[in-house]
């Protein structure tokens, strides 16, 4: 069985948070209904996957893994999957080969995770998403599929009531987004885990629902995340730089991402941080960790809300 890619584990320092403001009562759902939808991927080169026009993976995603869909969907219904393949930067490639494209295998499916035993139950990935490969090598490859979700036991508001940010003046929007990131940078660099928790409260609440967390799991994650921010981020954030603004979810979500490829970073090689959030803290000896935030602007409001990673 392939390794399940739990985003909240891979990005532990970036995970959900809640404390004493805006908490909600977590409704417990029976184990047999705790469905997590996913895309099972086998590939020999890095790829990027989008779910409902939201980037769900990075180029450094482990090969041969699975991507959870729950963070990127709000309710049952049609879900759009998009695959992108670029030439391999670290190898100096300029084309994506037909062979590499054809060796990408994607399957849609679901599973249930028993958190008490850490067992993966009812794992099935039996709906193939067939690749239509070109006849010659190409500078870039992209393909989309639609899948249907029918068994989610919840419905979330998420970014559904957000403004269409495509209608904003791009320069004005970017100025506003950068100002918000600067505020987040200072919070992280000061090690203010409590303030981070308050700003990510809505994300925390919805994460608890789509990952079927118990009250205890939720509070433990919040506590650990605050401690990690205090321990690892204080006076350890790199400058906020080399970024570009990205819109997702058909203009409902916005973020900043690093725009330049790297072959190494902070004494770790290879490490390509293109596409990362620019909210980056250096590792103690090498490498780095980053703090993803996807923002939306509620209708009738002028204040961003952090809703996903």
Regions found by a protein language model. Give the residues of each.
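Short, well-structured beta-strand segments within conserved domains
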Residues: 74-86
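A short, sequence-level motif marking secondary-structure junctions
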Residues: 61-65, 129-130
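Sec-dependent N-terminal signal peptides
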Residues: 4-13
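Beta-strand-rich recognition domains
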Residues: 19-47, 84-190, 194, 199-214, ...
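A glycine-anchored, Pro-Gly-centered beta-turn/N-cap motif
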Residues: 64, 70-77
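Short strand-turn-strand beta-turns centered on an Asx-Gly dipeptide
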Residues: 46-62
């Amino acid at each position: 069985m392939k390794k399940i890619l739990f985003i909240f584990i891979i990005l532990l320092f970036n995970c959900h948070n809640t404390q004493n403001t805006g908490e909600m009562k977590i409704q417990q759902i029976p184990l047999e209904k705790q469905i997590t939808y996913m895309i099972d991927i086998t590939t020999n080169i890095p790829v990027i996957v989008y779910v409902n026009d939201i980037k769900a993976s990075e180029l450094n995603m482990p090969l041969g893994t699975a991507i959870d869909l729950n963070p990127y969907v709000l309710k049952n219904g049609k879900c759009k999957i998009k695959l992108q393949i670029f030439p391999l930067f670290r190898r100096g490639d300029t084309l994506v080969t037909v062979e590499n494209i054809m060796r990408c295998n994607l399957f849609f499916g679901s599973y249930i995770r028993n958190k008490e035993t850490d067992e993966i139950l009812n794992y099935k990935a039996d709906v193939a998403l067939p690749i239509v490969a070109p006849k010659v090598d190409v500078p870039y490859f992209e393909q989309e599929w639609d899948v249907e979700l029918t068994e989610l036991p919840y419905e979330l508001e998420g970014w559904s009531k957000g403004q269409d940010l495509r209608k904003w003046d791009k320069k004005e929007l970017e100025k506003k987004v950068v100002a918000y990131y600067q505020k987040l940078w200072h919070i992280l660099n000061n090690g203010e885990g409590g303030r981070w928790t308050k700003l990510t409260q809505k994300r925390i609440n919805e994460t608890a629902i789509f990952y079927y967390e118990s009250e205890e799991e939720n509070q433990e994650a919040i506590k650990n995340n605050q401690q990690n921010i205090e321990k690892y981020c204080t006076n350890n954030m790199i400058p906020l730089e080399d970024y570009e603004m990205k819109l997702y979810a058909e203009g409902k979500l916005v973020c900043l991402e690093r725009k330049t490829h790297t072959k190494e970073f902070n004494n770790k090689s290879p490490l390509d941080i293109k596409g990362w959030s620019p909210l980056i803290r250096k590792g103690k000896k090498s490498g780095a960790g980053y703090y993803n935030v996807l923002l939306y602007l509620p209708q009738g409001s002028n204040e961003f809300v952090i809703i996903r990673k």
